Amino acid sequence: SIFSNIKMGKKTKLLFWNCHPLNLIPSLPGFRRLTASTSFLSKLILNTLLISFKLKSRNFLKLLERSKAILFMDGNNLNLSSELLKVKLSKPSFLPIPAKASSKLRWNKTLFKNSKSINFLWIGRIVDFKYFPLKRFLADLTEIQILKKIPVTLTVIGKGKFFDKFYEHATQNENVQLRFIDHIDLYDLDKFILENTDIMVAMGTSALEGAKLGVPTLLMDFSYKEIRGKYNYRWVHETKDYNLGCLINERNYKNNERTLLNKISEFQKSADSISLKELDYFEKNHNLSSVSNQLLDFVSESNCFFEELDSQRVFKKPLIYKFFYSIRKKILKNNFRSP
């Protein structure tokens, strides 16, 4: 089984939440970075080596739709799943990322009226798909500081496998004042954000940590490679279909009016208005209390049971996976034998 550690009764009701654009898309074991995209090569692999697994995933998605047992986190998840599996869902259902609302604390620009610089804050793990967006943001921030002489600071909260690589790159920057913090306790996070942030930069759940406080928050999309060309920045409240970060493709470059400089100009002119829009967007779409109620409704509507999926061998490990795991096992075994 794909999920060999999961044991459940035949009458167990199931509901699937697609939380990553490539969750339903087959990839080669050990080569996820190569196949985790919509590039020509990744599509070629999907439609040749992984064609049988692709068809299986396609049928699985259709089954879940019929059973009202599939939810998508956002439009990006839905669109990429539909595009790569060639499935058009008639009535897709969304369950957005939730976050617990802050009871009293709210962002206020007057807290920074005496500040001579614009203080940016990044929160998030620094891993493969977040490294390149963060690197690109620092490059854009540096360009603005040099050309427009706008004093800026960037605080980075987070660690990860790509932290050392980013730190080495960032510390060569002599234009942007940088500060690195490994971790801040969750109970202290709201207070820290409010006291240290003009503009927050993040993706996913981290972006909601700013929006729920009314902090003007720029969304970053994710990428497994360098980001070229003019990047399209947007506030959280400007996003569509609950997207809090998309897999970068040509659509991210269509609107060249959304440069980082333009967003900074908007902030300088109407920060309080942006703040109210961020907070309103969060309350309407991502507040934990409302999202949890939606989840309960979706659970009651699901007609999917483990017995049906098991009988159709949905969880059976694909042949291509067995082959790759066998080869990898032999390679590792031979390496251990080497002197």
Residue ranges and their predicted role:
Residues 62, 185-198, 202, 208, ...:
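Short acidic alpha-helix that forms the nucleotide-activated donor recognition element
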Residues 165-185:
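Nucleotide-activated donor-binding/catalytic signature segment of Leloir-type glycosyltransferases, i.e.
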Residues 250-319:
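A charged, aromatic-enriched C-terminal amphipathic alpha-helix characteristic of glycosyltransferases
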Residues 206-268:
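Catalytic binding pocket for nucleotide-activated donors in carbohydrate/polymer assembly enzymes
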Residues 100-165:
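Conserved catalytic-core segment of nucleotide-activated headgroup transferases in glycan assembly
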Residues 46-92, 101-104:
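A short, active-site helix/loop in glycosyltransferases that binds the activated sugar's phosphate group
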Residues 7-48, 71, 92, 219-220:
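Active-site proximal beta-strand in glycosyltransferases
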Residues 29-61, 305-339:
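Membrane-proximal basic amphipathic "stem/tether" segments
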